């Protein structure tokens, strides 16, 4: 009986298909994957520990740098958790704007995913088109927050400021033009023979296994599990919006691709509904002990200046307790577990990053496949190392 020689291959930490500094130790029998061991931590910055030494407001910029392709989702989950501890109500206008920006962020993130996923498999045209469309959302980000990626736009109690004049017009231009671009992507990929050969039947994980591994987001729905936090555990007024939750049937890479394409169309649908319901009003809660005063008060009254200085320098106390808040980030469930001891800083903050959990299932998805197909499996998970390593 011939002996089998197992060959070990290092994929990364500097490899274009890992989309960051991820190292995979792959054991092969010929070209067939037998085992995958992920090595992570190259981008570790200690965000959870850093938050224990910063006030609740000062932690917001740290969240931007988790999934840096979806910063406003990172902000949203964090501020919702703190608001739940404080027991404050966010104004309706602020909630609606949060939903609009969260769904625009979903579009922006999924555009990067389809661009890089297609490029990994050899479809360069889609990469160029998707980044062209993404630039429209990036420009809007810059107009509204002053930054293209690390926006830090959401605040505990609402938003840092109201949207600019012309915001609604810019958003409507995006939602009116994007569906046609989605048709283009599908025309280039969905029935493409090479694309089908690389994705259909590849990276299969059953619904039961997906649940056991704790997978969430499009990767879970691609396995046929009908679960979406926006619908099943709504926040920020998502219960007011009508949208479909797409699910797959064959639990493979192609199904996860189809789920994300439908999600982009549904994001456009949600944004349209939110724009139609956007009404004038305040964008910060009426909670002076937590929120910053209006700029005109800071510049023109000593009371406003002192108020601003106290919150900026000392923060605000949060009642003793603990809370968990999850949001439907483009990659899956992003969760914040915060423990407060009654002070102005988190006693402990634990982040549940979807990419970290989803990456744990990569061996289950890819074992028995060819090593060439591993690139497609990594792409279909849509991982970001910023939130994996934290």
From Swiss-Prot:
GO molecular function, one term: NADH:ubiquinone reductase (non-electrogenic) activity
One Pfam family named in its UniProt record: Complex1_49kDa
Keyword Transport: yes
One Gene Ontology term, aspect cellular component: plasma membrane
Entry's localization field: Cell inner membrane
Gene3D superfamilies, per database record: Cytochrome-c3 Hydrogenase, chain B
Keyword annotations: Cell inner membrane, Cell membrane, Membrane, NAD, Quinone, Translocase, Transport, Ubiquinone
Topology in membrane: Peripheral membrane protein
HAMAP family for this protein: NDH1_NuoD
Subunit: NDH-1 is composed of 14 different subunits. Subunits NuoB, C, D, E, F, and G constitute the peripheral sector of the complex.
Name recorded for this polypeptide: NADH-quinone oxidoreductase subunit D
Gene giving rise to this polypeptide: nuoD
């Amino acid at each position: 009986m011939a002996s089998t020689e197992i060959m070990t291959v290092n994929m990364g930490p500097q490899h274009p298909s890992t989309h960051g500094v991820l190292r995979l130790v792959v054991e092969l029998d010929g070209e067939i994957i037998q085992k995958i061991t992920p090595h992570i931590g190259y981008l570790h910055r200690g965000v959870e520990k850093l938050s224990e030494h910063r006030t609740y407001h000062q932690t917001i910029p740290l969240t931007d740098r988790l999934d840096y392709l979806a910063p406003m989702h990172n902000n949203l989950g964090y501020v919702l958790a703190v608001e739940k501890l404080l027991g404050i109500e966010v104004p309706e206008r602020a909630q609606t704007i949060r939903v609009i920006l969260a769904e625009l962020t979903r579009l922006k993130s999924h555009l990067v995913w389809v661009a890089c996923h297609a490029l990994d498999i050899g479809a360069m045209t889609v990469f160029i088109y998707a980044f062209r469309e993404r630039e429209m959302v990036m420009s809007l980000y810059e107009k509204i927050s002053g930054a293209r990626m690390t926006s830090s736009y959401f605040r505990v109690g609402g938003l840092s400021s109201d949207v600019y004049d012309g915001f609604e017009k810019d958003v409507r231009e995006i939602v009116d033009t994007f569906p046609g671009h989605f048709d283009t992507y599908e025309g280039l990929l969905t029935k493409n023979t090479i694309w089908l050969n690389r994705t259909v039947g590849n990276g299969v994980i059953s619904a039961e296994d997906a649940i056991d591994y704790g997978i969430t987001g499009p990767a879970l729905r691609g396995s046929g599990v009908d679960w979406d936090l926006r619908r099943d555990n709504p926040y920020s007024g998502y219960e007011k919006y009508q949208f479909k939750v797409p699910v797959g049937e064959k639990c493979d890479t192609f199904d996860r691709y189809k789920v994300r394409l439908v999600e982009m169309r549904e994001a456009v649908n949600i944004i349209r509904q939110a724009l139609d319901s956007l009404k004038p009003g305040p964008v910060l809660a009426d909670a002076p002990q937590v929120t910053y005063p209006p700029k005109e008060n800071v510049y023109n009254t000593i009371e406003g200046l002192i108020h601003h200085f106290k919150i900026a320098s000392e923060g605000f106390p949060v009642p003793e307790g603990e809370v968990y808040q999850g949001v439907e980030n483009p990659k899956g469930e992003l969760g914040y577990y915060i423990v407060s001891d009654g002070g102005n800083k988190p006693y402990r903050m634990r982040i549940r990053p979807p990419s970290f959990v989803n990456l744990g299932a990569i061996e289950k998805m890819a074992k028995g496949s060819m090593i060439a197909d591993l690139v497609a499996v990594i792409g279909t998970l849509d991982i970001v190392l910023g939130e994996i390593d934290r």
